Amino acid sequence: MNDRDPEFATKAVAVIELLLSPPTDGPLFCVDEKPGIGVRQPTAPDQPPVPRGPPARGRPARREFEYTRNGTVDLLAGFRVNDGRVCGMVRLKHRSREFCELLALLDEQTPVGQPIHLILDPVSSHWSAEGVTWLDAHPQRTFVFHFLPVHASWLSFIEVWFSILSRKCLRRADFADASIATQQIEAFMSTYNTHMAHPFEWKKGVRFYKRLKDKIAARSELQLAA
């Protein structure tokens, strides 16, 4: 539990309860960025494994450890808690401007008239003047921001999905340039939504949730006693 945010328990409980029981009036997205995805390519191709047996002694696959680095890309994405589908985009940066692009993408994929609920970090790009201006220019859509406590990204389901992306797409991937990295990440998101998407379950533990609730109750009692 991280107490750097004095309202950690209250904010965390609010987020957990949203994840346990998503709003019924519109979709709930866990939103975040995965920055610094390496665009790199090994200087030599992989060598396949050699089967063991006469006359060969066999050996495992070999992978070149030297790479040519060609920068990085950033993924901005939202995990829809209601059904487990992912909506995202790959960019070279993840500023307020790109965050507004993500909001526009979520807007496009949500039926008219439904509010869009977002669970997200309280970082500057998520509540900047540029973002406020964008929201004011799109009054036809209501966005409801539910901010995580400080340093509590791990509460969000999008972090779980980012780990899936890393294991299944990025771990051994080679990208010659940013466009190829973008294509492969977008292809994985499409494949995931078609064949693997499912709602996640809260697995941090009932005891953890109860501990937070007890902390809030104890604080309330102290305030009443004062």
Predicted feature descriptions by range:
Residues 10-104, 212, 219:
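Extended, low-complexity cationic-aromatic segments
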Residues 94-95, 118-130, 149-155, 180:
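Acidic, metal-coordinating catalytic cores used for nucleic-acid/nucleotide bond scission
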Residues 158-180, 193-196:
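Active-site proximal helix-loop segment of RNase H-like, two-metal nucleases, encompassing DDE(D)
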Residues 97-117:
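Short, basic/hydrophobic alpha-helical segments
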Residues 1-11:
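Short Lys/Arg-enriched helix C-cap and helix-to-coil transition segments
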Residues 180-226:
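C-terminal domain-tail junction helix/linker
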Residues 57, 62-68, 137-157, 173-175:
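RNase H-like polynucleotidyl transferase catalytic core
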Residues 29-31, 116-120, 146-149, 203:
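Short beta-strand segments
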